[in-house]
Amino acid sequence: MNSADFDIPFSSQSTEDWKNRVTKELKGKSFSDFLEWRSVDGFKIDSWQDSTDNAPIDLPPLKSPWKLLHPVYNEDAVTANAEALNALMNGAESIWFDKGFLGAAEILAHKDIDTSVAPVFTRSSSIFDVFQEFLKNDVEPDLTQADKNGLINGLRLRERGASIVQEVAYSISQGISLLNSGAKNENIYFNTGIGTSYLAEIAKTRALRLLWSNVLRVSGDTEENPRLIGINLSIDYPQADEYNNILRATTSALSGILGGVEFMMIEPWNRQWSDELQFSSRISRNIQNLIRDEGRLEKNLNAADGSYFLDQLTQQIAKEA
């Protein structure tokens, strides 16, 4: 076969040419009704994107895979420790104690957990104590630094009805306040609620990364990704057809991971109405095990990069925040 047979000229088509052709095919129906994506948060984006109006986003690259954060709700220190150790032996890479333990109970809860390998967090009403920074051998924590280590709790805001843009705006402003008070970037954690609006949540997480890297650049620090802890928004999970919540949790996990969180936690789908969490906790943990071991997303750290659609949505959220 002659190579000349492949020399078929193709004329370039502009975005406007494409839209005109589509409008013709729609036979009078509205282009925007069919081919503009609208999110529940009010974002409107053309479903067809190219490089014409999309400059690449300068996001700091992710350097390591996310860590599977397993929640422990038991209020007994010994039982909580046993659950944590079991989770770490079955795929978990970090632990979240929903109850804070003090004194001897704290020692029991953290027994045999190497916090240099598996970070341990505890929930608090006002501060996120990062125990892997404190629990080093028998050294007492420097309590004078406690107010310089904290959590920006965007999750709580989302649970109370805040929009994606409101969460981002609040989180960044609180982060700036912590920096101004003397906190170091590596000690600031952003707890972000991950809902089920798949693309919007990916873009929201990337918008947090984009804005925080800009904050660090302006303040003279090295541009880095924020320390993001993604937690699925399980507060709205219905009890009816409860196993459908597994799909909702999977969507949230993928959004957080593709968006670039450092830690991802999936709460049990029946957390809001049941105390029997052993089975649902295992399933929630295995959602991320499957994403990691079968989806292999830990091998592609920046999978969302290069998407014109996600880049434009990321910029919209960042601009409105």
Please report, for each region that a protein language model flagged, where it lies by residue.
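Short, solvent-exposed amphipathic alpha-helical segments in soluble enzyme
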Residues: A84-M89, A207-L210, S281-R282
